[in-house]
């Protein structure tokens, strides 16, 4: 994917109006440890250390859109119970329009409780309602949809078969949206996809596609057969089948098929990955990307989501970083302070050790390279803070730098040992270190630990300072003197 195209999309995200229609629920997580078996039965005993509640179902789709910066409205029906009020409160805190979330007396708001120990889900407990909506509440929802859908750029339908998406509600969504050429994207459930007729694109996973088509997917031919069956049955123009470690396959009504390979990642939890796919596909389409590019974007985001435990969101910074890794050119490694702060925070959350060093690096030489390679070996990521031209002039004098900041930045970013480069205008890198919070701060051997800018800050949160000796006789000053000496002799 083109990184600049993705960055441009996310810059426009705050203008995109997204409507999410579907089943809402709460996802409860009980995090703990287990090291014994119950004397009452052959089951593990979990000591709960932490509990948290997250928006689930269509709520996780909304959360993903919010994380991208989109404007979000949610239309659904919940109960007049504790879980229902908790959902409304959570949405309100995030600025979500909850006007079309109706509460039905006697209806049970869904809550899924997952018990997790040692990064493994041990058991899930579901408390939910699967009854279709009553006639009165169904009509209220339909009336709102018919009156307001035209104000949105895209509609996302998140079906968990919990009763909100009745045939009448679905027909109202697709018919109203299609009259205004508003795309409708559906994450489907069940085996009867005819209820989604009129949608722009469905996004089943492989298992769901097998159930809907009756075709076991074992190879490329059976995959195509399953897609053809679903598309002809539903009268569908576009179908995106997610295939886990095999990526995604987009089938279009014009006969075009796009297979999108996955990026190899460690998978911790597939919970909510389909919600992430739906959200990114919608963001891309609403933002003007072609469907195939939107699918590629969704594929990148899904790869990030499955590396996290539980229902989770993916940020623009994480997606841009992942896209940049696909095309690891020097441009993709040069980041401003704000974007890099988000990237580094995400890397720290994964337990990765971030190393930071800084300097002018005017006239790159072998001593620099060996120093930077040694710094990179101290952790998982090496961030280089690079003095701007103005900063170099204040430190080195009016004749420096010899190489301007743009060229220096690209030269440094071209080194494999450097993961990201960030220019700073100040005389010292203290503000940049404060923003990035690296665990390891590196300087050359001509420093003492006490003389390293940022030492106290890094050590205050458990980090450390490392000093790496310079290579004797290798310096920018020596190079300049040698050039002047040789060219002076020639003249």
Curated annotation (Swiss-Prot):
Keywords attached to this entry: ATP-binding, Carbohydrate metabolism, Kinase, Multifunctional enzyme, Nucleotide-binding, Nucleotidyltransferase, Transferase
Organism: Trichlorobacter lovleyi (strain ATCC BAA-1151 / DSM 17278 / SZ) (Geobacter lovleyi)
InterPro entries assigned to the protein according to its UniProt record, in alphabetical order: Bifunc_HldE, Carboh/pur_kinase_PfkB_CS, Cyt_trans-like, PfkB_dom, RfaE_dom_I, RfaE_dom_II, Ribokinase-like, Rossmann-like_a/b/a_fold
Gene name, Swiss-Prot/TrEMBL: hldE
Region (Ribokinase): 1-330
Main enzyme class: transferase
Catalyzed chemical reaction(s): D-glycero-beta-D-manno-heptose 7-phosphate + ATP = D-glycero-beta-D-manno-heptose 1,7-bisphosphate + ADP + H(+); D-glycero-beta-D-manno-heptose 1-phosphate + ATP + H(+) = ADP-D-glycero-beta-D-manno-heptose + diphosphate
CDD domains: RfaE_like
Database matches in SUPFAM superfamilies: Nucleotidylyl transferase, Ribokinase-like
Highest classification ranks of the organism: Bacteria, Pseudomonadati, Thermodesulfobacteriota, Desulfuromonadia, Geobacterales
UniProt entry tagged with the keyword ATP-binding: yes
Oligomer and partners: Homodimer.
Domain of life per record: Bacteria
Function, as annotated: Catalyzes the ADP transfer from ATP to D-glycero-beta-D-manno-heptose 1-phosphate, yielding ADP-D-glycero-beta-D-manno-heptose.
Active site: 275
GO molecular function: ATP binding; heptose 7-phosphate kinase activity; heptose-1-phosphate adenylyltransferase activity; phosphotransferase activity, alcohol group as acceptor
Pathway info: Nucleotide-sugar biosynthesis; ADP-L-glycero-beta-D-manno-heptose biosynthesis; ADP-L-glycero-beta-D-manno-heptose from D-glycero-beta-D-manno-heptose 7-phosphate: step 1/4; Nucleotide-sugar biosynthesis; ADP-L-glycero-beta-D-manno-heptose biosynthesis; ADP-L-glycero-beta-D-manno-heptose from D-glycero-beta-D-manno-heptose 7-phosphate: step 3/4
Record GO biological process: ADP-L-glycero-beta-D-manno-heptose biosynthetic process
Name of the protein in its database record: Bifunctional protein HldE
Enzyme Commission number(s): 2.7.1.167, 2.7.7.70
Annotated stretches, region: Cytidylyltransferase: 356-491
């Amino acid at each position: 994917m083109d990184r600049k195209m993705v960055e441009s999309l996310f810059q426009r995200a705050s203008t995109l109006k997204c409507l999410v229609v579907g089943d809402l629920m709460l996802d409860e997580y009980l995090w703990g440890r287990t090291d014994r078996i119950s004397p009452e039965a052959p089951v593990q005993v979990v000591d709960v250390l932490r509990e948290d509640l997250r928006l689930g179902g269509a709520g996780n789709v909304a959360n993903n859109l919010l994380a991208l910066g989109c404007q979000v409205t949610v239309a659904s029906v919940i109960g007049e119970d504790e879980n229902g009020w908790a959902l409304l409160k959570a949405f309100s805190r995030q600025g979500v329009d909850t006007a079309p979330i109706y509460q039905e007396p006697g209806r049970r708001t869904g809550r899924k409780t997952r018990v997790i120990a040692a990064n493994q889900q041990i058991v899930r407990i579901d408390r939910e309602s699967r009854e279709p909506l009553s006639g009165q509440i169904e009509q209220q929802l339909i009336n709102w949809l018919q009156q307001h859908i035209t104000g949105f750029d895209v509609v996302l339908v998140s079906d968990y078969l919990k009763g909100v998406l009745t045939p009448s509600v679905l027909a109202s969504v697709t018919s109203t949206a299609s009259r205004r050429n508003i795309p409708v994207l559906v994450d489907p459930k069940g085996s009867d996809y005819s209820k989604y007729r009129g949608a722009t694109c469905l996004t089943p996973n492989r298992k769901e596609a097998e159930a809907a088509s009756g075709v076991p997917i074992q190879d490329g031919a059976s995959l195509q057969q399953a897609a053809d069956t679903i598309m002809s049955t539903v009268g569908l123009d576009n179908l995106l089948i997610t295939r886990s470690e095999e990526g995604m396959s987009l089938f279009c009504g014009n006969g075009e098929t796009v297979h999108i390979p996955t990026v190899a990642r460690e998978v911790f939890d597939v919970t909510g990955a389909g919600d992430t796919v739906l959200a990114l596909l919608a963001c891309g389409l609403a933002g003007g990307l072609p469907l195939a590019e939107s699918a590629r974007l969704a594929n990148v985001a899904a790869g990030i989501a499955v590396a996290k435990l539980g229902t989770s969101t993916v940020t623009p910074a994480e997606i841009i970083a992942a896209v940049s890794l696909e095309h690891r050119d020097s441009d993709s490694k040069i980041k401003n302070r704000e974007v890099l702060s988000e990237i580094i925070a995400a890397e720290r959350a994964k337990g990765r050790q971030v190393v930071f060093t800084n300097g002018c690096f005017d006239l790159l030489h072998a001593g620099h390279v060996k120093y930077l390679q040694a710094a990179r070996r101290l952790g998982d990521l090496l961030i280089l803070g690079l003095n701007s031209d103005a900063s170099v002039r204040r430190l080195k004098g009016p004749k420096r730098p010899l190489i301007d900041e743009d060229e220096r930045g690209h030269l440094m970013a071209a080194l494999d040992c450097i993961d990201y480069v960030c220019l700073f205008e100040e005389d010292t890198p203290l503000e940049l270190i404060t923003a990035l919070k690296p665990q390891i701060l590196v300087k050359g051997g001509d420093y003492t630990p006490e003389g390293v800018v940022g030492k106290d800050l890094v050590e205050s949160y458990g980090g450390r300072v490392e000093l790496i000796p310079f290579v004797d006789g290798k310096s920018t000053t020596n190079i300049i003197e040698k050039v002047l000496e040789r060219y002076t002799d020639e003249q």
